[in-house]
Amino acid sequence: MPDIQLPDGSHRQFAEPVTGLTLARAIGSGLARAAVAMRVDGILKDLSAVLDQDAEVAIVTRDSADGLEVIRHSTAHLLAQAVQSLYPEAQVTIGPVIDNGFYYDFAFPRGFTPEDLEAIEARMHALVKENLPVQREMLSREDAIALFEKMGEDYKVEIIRAIPRGEPLSLYRQGDFVDLCRGPHVPSTGVLGAFKLQRVAGAYWRGDSRNPMLQRIYGTAWAQQKDLDAYLQQLAEAEKRDHRRIGTELELFSIQEDAGGGLVFWHPMGSRVRRVIEDFWKEAHVEAGYDLLYTPHIAHEQLWYTSGHKDFYSESMFDPMQDEGQAYQLKPMNCPFHILIYKDKLHSYRDLPIRWAELGTVYRHEMSGALHGLMRVRGFTQDDAHVFCRPDQIEAEIGAVLVLVRKILGTFGFDQYEINLSTRPGHSVGSDEIWDAATQALRNALERAGLEYQVDAGGGAFYGPKIDLKIQDAIGRKWQCSTVQLDFNLPERFAMEYVAEDGARKVPIMVHRAIFGSIERFFGVLIEHYEGKFPVWLAPVQAVVLPISEHYSEYAESVSDVLVKRGIRAETDLRNEKIGYKIRAHTLRRVPYLLVVGEREKEAGTVAVRDRNGQDLGTLSIDAVGATLQKMDQARVNTLEWQG
């Protein structure tokens, strides 16, 4: 007689084994209608799974995070079923869940067209209406291989052969479609429906360019149609904000294919913004007690063996280069360089904490298919910092880091966060004592800062717990940004030491910390967050002076000179064009303030001020305009509201 404990602590007892769906119905008809899966003693399972012994069970509903995962996974299977029903020659490979959706890779002799996607999506909706039961079956390794060989599914056979012997194999049937899968899945195809196929891309089998090219169909799926509609609206808004298009229009940056993919060229306008970002970052770090470092771009290959990168990270590193019999490699990270500086002399406990920061360019060997504008590149500048401290200083240092993170991100207009605390995984280095103390220090620092967070149990790196922070942009998207990572591994690998109060040699704690993640990616996020309409303190051109005719060019230049001497990024448009044309041109350039001058302004020593939204701010003296722009720039104001 199974005794089932529910999340609220209540119990349900049954005279005989029951399925998850039976349990859901016993709790309530509404819950049963919303149910898509269940967690049994923490393990996600199908609703059809039998509960034949005592267990803690939570019914998973369609609108929960687990529920969305199951819906998206099941929709990927629905996609594969639809493709094979329309194109029997297509072979299925893999179809995982990704952020906000799913994809499925197919071996198909030609590329899928937009018309194909329409037909596939229509077929998927027809299969939903059929409300086909989704059934799980267990097979032996031999039977599974025989089944998929008979079906001509070569890729599935390859996958099965790679699975360790003795590991249970399951497949799922819905109608005449069969797929190898661990599950779980929705009870029937009728549960699905709020989905949209989005695009097709090429993808190599197993991500290896030596393997066949597959056709990858991307889609999104949601619990309800209203959620899908909201997401598609967000995508449409995101398309308007695409940093690649805006970056080209505003001449901020480019990717030059003649030089290679994933390598960013900063144009003059983008370089101005970058300089503002970096100057603020440096100023904030110096105020917070950091010293700034500069380190090389390459190092002996042996250094990367010492750090462990050659063992655990070599696929993301560019190949070594040879010089006089010595192998060098581009750095994928800055940490070993900071450690070498630390080891240049012996430190006392009184020297700690040591806080070092660097805007260091690193290089990652990203696959070409993964590259995406500024968001995924091969060469980028990390806003890297490392704190070397004693165990008793961890909490205070993490607290100080969180203060700095919020100060810097808040200045750019980001004040809504999603925070995860990732704890010790199964395989790790370091004693129980140091892990427990360090994890508690991170908790305490978060709670003292009044920050809400979720615990990602077992999600930490093998060398220490960490805090990850995502920022939310203007249209509600979340971007991984800041990371605070404790490291018990590198100090040991590099034999780092400090002299403790009792004279003993001890190993310091190392804190890795980035706030932006990378300058390039953060700039891409900024472009999309502001839709290229940077606040005045970030704008590459803060004000442009527009004479209504060439007769006022000299006066316009004198106005610009006054502003430039105040440190304002001002320009003058002396083209022989109508004033309406100039206003439109610089509005499209997203210049915050347009200063129009003619006879009246020249006589009075004034300018007519308007913002890029077309609001008339009145006629003001040159000094008043300069003082206001200077004040807004120095205060790092994030709105267009005139502060005069």
Swiss-Prot record:
This protein's name: Threonine--tRNA ligase
Similarity remark: Belongs to the class-II aminoacyl-tRNA synthetase family.
UniProt record, GO biological process: threonyl-tRNA aminoacylation
Subcellular location: Cytoplasm
Source organism of this protein record: Acidithiobacillus ferrooxidans (strain ATCC 23270 / DSM 14882 / CIP 104768 / NCIMB 8455) (Ferrobacillus ferrooxidans (strain ATCC 23270))
Residues the record lists as binding Zn(2+): C335, H386, H512
Cofactor entry: Zn(2+)
GO molecular function, one term: threonine-tRNA ligase activity
EC number: 6.1.1.3
Signal sequence coordinates: none
NCBIfam families, sorted: thrS
EC top class, as a word: ligase
Keywords, alphabetical: Aminoacyl-tRNA synthetase, ATP-binding, Cytoplasm, Ligase, Metal-binding, Nucleotide-binding, Protein biosynthesis, RNA-binding, tRNA-binding, Zinc
Major place of residence: cytoplasm
Limits of the TGS domain: 1-61
One Pfam family recorded for the sequence: tRNA_SAD
GO CC entries: cytoplasm
